[in-house]
């Protein structure tokens, strides 16, 4: 039995948040075996933003909130890891309980509210990693403090502190658990924010060829008009990419769990159809001019392939790990490679957006 097989029964006797804390402790212990399956199939390699990804399957933000275990997570076979969301100043987030497993639905509801240790320890760990020459692409996902009255200042602080240490940056303006945050997705507000953080990044990194790519993370709940605003704001400001999407406030009628009506954002299997449809719509709007990371409901190679065909240059998973364990990463990669080859694609890039062009 593997380590996950040993721990899984223990997780069921813990609250979801306790199980998460135990997972972090195990990853920090150095006891995690290499589950990567060896070198990735060359068909999975892809180059985006000048970064060479060994495979397109990444870990979404929210697991390694404080940038504690990025290197251990690469032992699962991820092509990249996104740490955060980190806020400028420490904050506890929302009261417990704030994380719920919907086992019958293979879904999760969370209302964490950007619990964060703040930028100082996050940046220290990123800096340690950079100084040690560790390999592996690590992104930094930044947000705003709940009580902050100046979103521009908070996001600017996050970008300024992390841009020279992370491989890519993400401004998270789509969490449903910070009051008023999603209002930043409106066109005027989004253009103002993105113009500001891009200027902060550029001032910190004067050489255009060496600038860390900056992405924006948006919600799957955006209607067509709002999605068009996101596309136009992104193209107008020159942001480098978009993540579609975050958790959803919607509740599909199919949900069975007793936790289905808990307040917070829903992730996992029930989000797959919505997030993939919105991904395709966004890809059409940006016309392939901006790379998109597809997130939401991925639990198989088929799901990942659907995201790629809908317009994702890269994909991320998180909730599915709760139900299927870390071995899922290698299974997704193996199946994705087989599907690409079966359809005659020589690379991930060749398949991006083929269903929506």
Curated annotation (Swiss-Prot):
Binding site for substrate: 65, 110-114, 172, 177, 246-247
Keyword Cell membrane: yes
Cofactor(s) of this protein: FMN
A single cellular component GO annotation: cytoplasm
Disulfide bonds: none
Enzyme class (EC, first level): oxidoreductase
UniProt keyword list: Cell membrane, Flavoprotein, FMN, Membrane, Oxidoreductase, Pyrimidine biosynthesis
Any one GO BP annotation for this protein: 'de novo' UMP biosynthetic process
Keyword Kinase recorded: no
Active-site residues, as the UniProt record annotates them: 175
Gene3D superfamilies: Aldolase class I
Cofactor descriptive note: Binds 1 FMN per subunit.
Entry's EC annotation: 1.3.5.2
Topology versus the membrane: Peripheral membrane protein
Residues noted as binding FMN in the record, renumbered to the chain: 61-65, 85, 141, 172, 217, 245, 268, 297, 318-319
Annotated InterPro entries: Aldolase_TIM (IPR013785), DHO_dehydrogenase (IPR050074), Dihydroorotate_DH_2 (IPR005719), Dihydroorotate_DH_cat (IPR005720), Dihydroorotate_DH_CS (IPR001295)
Subcellular location: Cell membrane
Pathway of action: Pyrimidine metabolism; UMP biosynthesis via de novo pathway; orotate from (S)-dihydroorotate (quinone route): step 1/1
Role: Catalyzes the conversion of dihydroorotate to orotate with quinone as electron acceptor.
Protein name in UniProt: Dihydroorotate dehydrogenase (quinone)
Gene name linked to the record: pyrD
């Amino acid at each position: 039995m593997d380590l996950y097989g040993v721990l899984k029964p223990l997780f069921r006797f813990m609250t979801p948040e306790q199980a998460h804390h135990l997972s972090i402790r195990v990853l920090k212990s150095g006891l995690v075996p290499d589950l990567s399956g060896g070198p990735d199939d060359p068909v999975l390699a892809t180059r985006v933003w000048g970064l060479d990804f060994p495979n397109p399957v990444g870990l979404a933000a929210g697991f390694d909130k404080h940038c504690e275990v990025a290197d251990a997570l690469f032992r699962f076979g991820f092509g990249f890891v996104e740490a955060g969301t980190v806020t400028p100043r420490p904050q506890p987030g929302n009261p417990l309980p704030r994380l719920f497993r919907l086992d019958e639905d293979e879904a999760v509801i969370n209302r964490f509210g950007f619990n964060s240790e703040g930028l100082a320890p996050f940046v220290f760990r990123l800096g340690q990693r950079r100084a040690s020459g560790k390999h592996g692409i690590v992104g930094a996902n930044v947000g705003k403090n709940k009580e902050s009255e100046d979103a521009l200042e908070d996001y600017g602080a996050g970008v300024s502190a992390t841009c020279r240490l992370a491989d890519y940056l993400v401004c998270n303006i789509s969490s449903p658990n910070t009051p008023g945050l999603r209002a930043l997705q409106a066109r005027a507000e989004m253009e103002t924010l993105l113009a500001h953080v891009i200027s902060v990044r550029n001032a910190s990194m004067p050489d255009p060829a060496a600038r860390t790519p900056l992405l924006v993370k948006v919600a799957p709940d955006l209607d067509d008009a709002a999605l068009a605003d996101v596309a136009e704001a992104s193209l107008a400001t020159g942001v480098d990419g978009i993540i579609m999407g975050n958790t959803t406030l919607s509740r599909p009628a199919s949900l069975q769990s007793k936790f289905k009506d808990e307040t917070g954002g829903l992730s996992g299997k029930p989000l797959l159809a919505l997030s993939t449809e919105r991904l395709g719509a966004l890809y059409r709007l940006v016309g392939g001019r901006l790379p998109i990371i597809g997130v939401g409901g991925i639990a198989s190679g088929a799901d990942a392939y659907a995201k790629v065909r809908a317009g994702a240059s890269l994909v991320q998973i998180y909730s599915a790990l709760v139900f299927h364990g870390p071995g899922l990463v290698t299974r997704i990669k193996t199946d994705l490679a087989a599907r690409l080859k079966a359809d005659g694609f020589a690379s991930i890039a060749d398949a991006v957006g083929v269903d929506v062009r």
